UniProtKB/Swiss-Prot annotation:
This is Leucine--tRNA ligase. The gene is leuS. It comes from Methanosarcina mazei (strain ATCC BAA-159 / DSM 3647 / Goe1 / Go1 / JCM 11833 / OCM 88) (Methanosarcina frisia). Keywords: Aminoacyl-tRNA synthetase, ATP-binding, Cytoplasm, Ligase, Nucleotide-binding, Protein biosynthesis. It is an enzyme of class 6 (ligase). ATP binds at residue 635.
Length: 966
C-alpha cells in the first residue's frame, strides 16, 4: 500500500478494473435477484449534490445486497423529454446573460462549448455524456449496457405501446380540466418545467356573484357557507379594475374584476371580452345584493386586498374572520366621504352563522379581544385566524340562519353548497394556485381550463382501488410515509398527459399531442430489460411492435405469432420474456421525497394498470433533500455543487461517505466544507490503520487464546455487524455508517489503547467488508493489499454471529472505561497531580440489592417501595436499613431509564469487580501516571475521606491522593 491515502489514484485504478472485469453487469442465474431502480436524472444541467445523495443511497443498497449473495441489477437511464431542455436551448441561443453565467460558472461548462449547446439535441448529447462520466467517477455499480435516453426511437416505441394499452382500458380520457399552464409556451407545465412554485397545487374556489344593477362583483372563497355572514365587500382603491363581458353556457353577464383576474378568466371555460376600465372609486360605497340571502351589503375600501388573488374583490365576514373584523373596526372613525360613504359603519351588525363549542356568538370579535390584537398589522391576527378557522372547520355546525343547511358540520358542507350555489347561479367555480407559479421560461403561469385535452383518469375509483391494494402489499421505507402515499392517492385527480411543445413521444392515437414528461417515466424500469438486447444489436426499431411488448412484458399472445410479425427468432423472444420474468417486479424503488406526490404515485398507478399483480413493485424508499451551506440548491439559479466537482475536490469515497452520514434518510442534509474535511481526516485514519495492520504481517485467529479485551472486541464487532445490516435493510445510511465506521473506529482505538493486538487482522477483515458499500474504492485497495484476488465488491458481507457475543466482556470494559473517565475528570476539575489512586468496589449488600431488583422486575414493573420492603426482609441486610432507601431511590430510576440490561448482566454473570479492576490496574496506572490500588468498600484498609461509602456496582468510589510538592 502507498504511504498516504491518495483517493484519486485509487479510484481511477478500481474504476478501470471494475469496467474491465464487468462485475456489475447482471444476467439471470440461479441466485435470488434484487432489482433496484432510482429515478433517472433530468438532463438540463450537470448532476448535483441532491442527485449524489439519492443515487449513492441506491448504490449502497445495491452493493450491500450484492455482497449478501443476491444477483443485483442496478441500471440507469436519462430523462430528457418535456420543455425544460427546449427552454434552455432557447436561452443559450439568445445568449441570456444569467443562463450563460450559471451554466459556465456553476455547472462548469467550458466557455468555448456552452454557446454551441443551442439546440435540445446538442444539450442532450452533452449532458448524457457528462452524467455518465460523473456517475462512473463516484463509483456507482451500474450496469451501463442498459442505458438509454427518453428520446431514443426505440424508447418512443415502448411509450407508444404503454399509452395505446392505457387508452384501450379507458384510463386516458379527453375533456376539460384545470391544469398548470404557461401562456408563453402555450403548454401545460409539470414540476420539471417550473422555476418557482413547484409545491403549488390547484385549489378550487367558489365565486359568489354579488350584484349591483347589471354588474356582477364576484368574490372567491374557500368557504361558501360564510356567504350567509357577509356584511360588506372589500375593494382596493389603488387597484385597476375592468368591466368584462363573461359568457358561459349561453349565459351572458358583466363582471367587474381586477386586471390580474381578467387575465386569469381568459384561460377558463368562459368566453371573456374586455369592455372598459372601471375606476376603483366607482365600485366603492355601492350597495350590492347578496345572491344567497338577498341582503344588501356595502362595498368598502381596503388596501390589503391583493389584485392577483381571486377576483381582486373580497367578501367580508367580520363575525367569523378576525381580519375582516379588524378591518371593519379600523374604519369606524375613518373619513370615507371621498367614496360617498357617510353612514356610521358601527351600525353594520355582525352576522353569526356557525355554532362553535369554544366560542360564543361572534368568534372573531371574541378572539381579537381576548388576544389583545390591536389592528390588522398585529402579527397575532394571523394566529387568531388560524385558531378560529381550525375550530370552526373541525367542530362548527351551521345555525338556523342558513335555512335547510342548519345542523350541517362545516367540514361537510362545502361541496353541497357549491353544487347548490352553481345550480341557482349564485356562484361559479374558479381555480387558483395555492402559491404563485413561474415557468422556467420566466412567465407567470395560470390555471387553464383546457378543452380537448388528454388526461390520465387518475380519479377513477377502480384504478385507485388497485393502487391502494398494491401499496398495502408493499414495504414503504420509512413506514411513516405510507400515510402520505395513501393521502396522495386519495387526493390525486385526473392529470393532463399531453402537451403541444417540447421533446417526447407523440400520442399514438392523436399525433398532434406529445406525451408529457412525467407521463413517459412511469414503467421504464421494464424497458431496462429490453434495452440490454437493443444494446447487443439483437433488437431493432422495426421489431418493437405492440404484440412484441404485449408478449415479452405481459405474456399475452405467443412467441410464434410475434416471430412471424417481427422476423425475430422465437428463441430470442422467449429469452427476453424469461429475462423479464426473472428481474420483475422491481424490488426497490428509491427516490427523493419531492417525487412522492407525482412520479412515485404515477409509478404505482401505471404498474397496476398494465401488469399482473405478481409484477407489481415490492418496495418504495424515500430520502430527503440536500442544501449547500444552508442554502437551497437550484440548477437554474445556483448555488449548486455538482457531483463531478465534489468528486474532483474530495474524492469519490469521501464524497459518498459524507453525503450519507450528514443526515438520516428522510431528513434534509446540508453539505458543509468543514464536515467533509472532517470526513477526510477520518478516512485517513482508517487507511493508516489498515496499512499498519497489513504491514505488521500478524494474522491472529479466533482459535488463539483470547484475553478479555479480545473477547470484548469480538463482541463489539458482532454488534456493529448486526446494527449495520439492520440499518442498511431499513436504508438508514447514517445509522449504518455510524456503526460500521465512526463507533467502530473508536472501539478499535480503545482496543489498541488497552494493548489489544491479536485480533487486529480479524477486525480489519470484517471492517473493510462492512465499509465496502460506502467507500468501495478504498476497500478494494485494502482488500487487495490483504492478499485477496477477488474484489471485495463480490465478497461475503459480514453476518452476525451471536455465539461471539460476550456481555460480560463488554460490561467489564465499560466499567474500566467509565472508571478511567471518572478519574481523569476528577483530576481535570481539581487540577491536582495524583500521587496515588484508590478504587473502592461496591459492598456486597449493594450487589445483592441489584440482584434482587433484577429478580423483581421479571415479575412486575420495579417500584421503590417493593424493592425496599424486599431488601429489609432479609436478615443479613437489616443493619443497612438507613442506607437501603437512598440506594434504592437512586437505582430504580436507572432501571426504568435503560440501565436494567447492564445490571442484569452484572447480576447473572456474577462479575467480580475487584478482580476486574486488579487485572486492569496496570493499564490504569499507565494512563493516569501513578499507582492504583484496589480495595473493597466492605473492608477498606485505607480510606481517609470515607469515599468507600459511595461505591456502587459498576461504579467504584475514587480517592485520589495528591502529590505533595517537594
Amino acid at each position: 500500500m502507498e504511504q498516504d491515502y491518495k483517493p484519486h489514484e485509487i479510484e481511477n485504478k478500481w474504476q478501470k478494473k471494475w469496467n474491465e472485469s464487468r462485475i456489475f453487469q447482471a444476467e439471470p442465474d440461479k441466485r435470488e435477484k434484487f432489482f433496484i431502480t432510482i429515478p433517472y436524472p433530468y438532463l438540463n444541467g450537470n448532476l448535483h449534490a441532491g442527485h449524489t445523495r439519492t443515487f449513492t443511497i441506491g448504490d449502497v443498497v445495491a452493493r450491500h445486497k450484492r455482497m449478501l449473495g443476491y444477483n443485483v441489477l442496478y441500471p440507469m437511464g436519462f430523462h430528457v423529454t418535456g420543455t425544460p431542455i427546449v427552454g434552455l436551448a432557447e436561452l443559450i441561443a439568445s445568449r441570456d446573460p444569467q443562463t450563460m453565467d450559471v451554466y459556465e460558472r456553476l455547472h462548469g461548462i467550458p466557455g468555448d462549448i456552452l454557446p454551441a449547446l443551442d439546440t435540445p439535441e446538442k444539450i442532450v448529447d452533452y449532458f448524457k455524456v457528462e452524467a455518465e462520466k460523473a456517475m462512473r467517477m463516484i463509483g456507482y455499480s451500474i450496469d451501463w449496457r442498459r442505458k438509454f435516453t427518453t428520446t431514443d426511437p426505440t424508447y418512443k416505441k415502448f411509450i407508444e405501446w404503454q399509452y395505446t394499452r392505457l387508452e384501450e382500458k379507458d384510463l386516458i380520457v379527453k375533456g376539460s380540466h384545470p391544469v398548470k399552464w404557461c401562456p408563453n409556451d402555450n403548454n401545460p407545465v409539470e414540476d420539471h418545467d417550473i422555476l418557482h412554485g413547484e409545491e403549488a397545487t390547484i385549489v378550487e374556489y367558489t365565486l359568489i356573484k354579488f350584484r349591483y344593477r347589471d354588474l356582477v362583483l364576484p368574490c372567491a372563497t374557500l368557504r361558501p357557507e360564510t356567504t350567509y355572514g357577509v356584511t360588506n365587500l372589500w375593494v382596493n382603491p389603488n387597484v385597476d379594475y375592468v368591466k368584462a363581458r363573461v359568457e358561459k353556457d349561453g349565459n351572458v353577464e358583466f363582471w367587474v374584476v381586477s386586471r390580474d383576474a381578467f387575465r386569469k378568466l381568459t384561460f377558463t371555460d368562459r368566453t371573456v371580452e374586455y369592455v372598459e376600465d372601471m375606476p376603483a372609486k366607482s365600485i366603492i360605497g355601492i350597495k350590492l345584493t347578496n345572491p344567497v340571502t338577498g341582503d344588501e351589503v356595502i362595498s368598502l375600501p381596503a388596501s390589503f386586498v391583493k389584485p392577483e388573488n381571486g377576483s381582486g374583490i373580497v367578501m367580508s365576514v367580520p363575525a367569523h374572520a378576525p381580519f375582516d373584523y379588524l378591518a371593519l373596526r379600523d374604519l369606524y372613525d375613518a373619513d370615507l366621504s371621498e367614496y360617498g360613504i357617510t353612514e356610521d359603519l358601527r351600525k353594520i351588525e355582525l352576522i353569526s352563522l356557525i355554532q362553535v363549542p369554544e366560542f360564543g356568538e361572534f368568534p372573531a370579535k371574541e378572539i381579537v379581544e381576548s388576544m389583545g390584537i390591536s389592528d390588522q398589522k398585529d402579527p397575532k391576527a394571523e394566529e387568531a385566524t388560524k385558531i378560529v378557522y381550525r375550530r370552526e372547520f373541525h367542530g362548527g355546525v351551521l345555525k338556523e340562519l342558513t335555512g335547510k343547511y342548519k345542523g350541517y358540520p362545516v367540514s361537510k358542507i362545502k361541496d353541497i353548497l357549491t353544487r347548490d350555489f352553481l345550480a341557482s347561479n349564485a356562484g361559479e367555480t374558479f381555480y387558483e394556485f395555492s402559491e404563485p407559479v413561474v415557468c422556467r421560461c420566466g412567465t407567470p403561469c395560470v390555471v387553464n381550463m383546457v378543452k380537448g385535452q388528454w388526461f390520465l383518469n387518475y380519479s377513477n375509483p377502480d384504478w385507485k382501488a388497485k393502487v391502494y391494494k398494491c401499496l398495502g402489499q408493499m414495504r414503504v421505507i420509512p413506514t411513516e410515509y405510507r400515510v402520505e402515499f395513501e393521502n396522495k392517492i386519495d387526493w390525486l385527480k385526473d392529470k393532463a398527459c399531453a402537451r403541444r411543445k417540447g421533446l417526447g413521444t407523440r400520442l399514438p392515437f392523436d399525433k398532434e399531442w406529445l406525451i408529457e414528461s412525467l407521463g413517459d417515466s412511469t414503467i421504464y424500469m421494464s424497458y431496462y430489460i429490453i434495452a440490454r438486447f437493443i444494446e447487443k444489436g439483437e433488437l431493432a426499431l422495426e421489431h418493437l411492435t405492440l404484440s412484441f411488448f404485449d408478449y415479452v412484458l405481459l405474456g399475452k399472445g405467443d412467441s410464434a405469432a410475434v416471430s412471424a410479425e417481427t422476423g425475430l427468432k422465437p428463441e430470442l423472444i422467449e429469452e427476453i420474456r424469461s429475462h423479464f420474468n426473472y428481474w420483475y417486479p422491481v424490488d426497490l424503488r428509491s427516490s427523493g421525497k419531492d417525487l412522492v406526490p407525482n412520479h412515485l404515485l404515477f409509478f404505482l398507478f401505471h404498474h397496476v394498470a398494465l401488469f399482473e399483480e405478481e409484477k407489481w413493485p415490492k418496495a418504495l424508499a424515500v430520502n430527503g433533500f440536500v442544501s449547500l451551506e444552508g442554502q437551497k440548491m437550484s440548477k437554474s439559479k445556483g448555488p449548486i455543487l455538482t457531483l463531478e466537482s465534489a468528486v474532483s475536490s474530495y474524492g469519490a469515497d469521501i464524497t459518498r461517505m459524507y453525503i450519507l452520514s450528514t443526515a438520516e434518510q428522510t431528513q434534509d442534509a446540508d453539505w458543509q466544507k468543514a464536515g467533509i474535511d472532517s470526513a477526510r481526516r477520518q478516512v485517513d485514519r482508517f487507511y493508516a490503520f489498515a496499512k499498519d495492520v497489513i504491514e505488521s504481517g500478524k494474522r491472529g485467529t479466533l482459535s488463539a487464546e483470547l484475553k478479555q479485551i479480545d473477547r470484548w472486541m469480538l463482541s463489539r464487532m458482532q454488534n456493529y455487524i448486526k446494527e449495520t445490516n439492520a440499518a442498511l435493510d431499513s436504508i438508514q445510511t447514517r445509522e449504518a455508517i455510524q456503526n460500521s465506521f465512526f463507533l467502530l473506529i473508536n472501539d478499535v482505538r480503545w482496543y489498541q489503547r488497552r494493548g489489544g493486538e491479536a485480533l487486529l487482522y480479524y477486525v480489519l477483515d470484517n471492517w473493510v467488508r462492512l465499509m465496502a458499500p460506502f467507500t468501495p474504492h478504498l476497500c478494494e485497495e485494502v482488500w487487495e493489499a490483504m492478499g485477496h484476488e477477488d474484489p471485495v465488491s463480490l465478497a461475503q458481507y459480514p453476518l452476525y454471529n451471536e455465539d461471539l457475543i460476550d456481555n460480560g466482556a463488554e460490561l467489564s470494559e465499560e466499567a474500566v472505561k467509565s472508571t478511567l473517565n471518572d478519574i481523569e475528570e476528577i483530576i481535570r476539575v481539581t487540577k491536582m497531580t495524583p500521587q496515588k489512586v484508590y478504587l473502592y468496589t461496591a459492598p456486597a449488600w449493594k450487589a445483592e440489592a441489584i440482584r434482587c431488583a433484577c429478580g423483581l422486575q421479571v415479575e412486575a414493573p420495579l417500584e421503590v417501595g417493593t424493592l425496599i420492603k424486599t431488601l429489609m426482609a432479609k436478615p443479613e441486610l437489616k443493619r443497612f436499613g438507613k442506607e437501603i432507601p437512598k440506594f434504592v431511590q437512586k437505582i430504580v430510576p436507572e432501571f426504568k431509564s435503560g440501565g436494567a440490561e447492564r445490571y442484569e448482566t452484572f447480576a447473572y454473570l456474577g462479575l467480580d469487580e475487584k478482580d476486574l479492576l486488579k487485572e486492569s490496574a496496570s493499564f490504569l496506572e499507565k494512563e493516569i501516571g501513578c499507582p492504583v490500588e484496589i480495595q473493597s468498600a466492605d473492608s477498606p484498609e485505607y480510606d481517609p475521606q470515607k469515599k468507600s461509602r459511595f461505591a456502587e456496582p459498576l461504579r467504584p468510589a475514587i480517592y485520589i491522593e495528591e502529590k505533595k510538592e517537594e
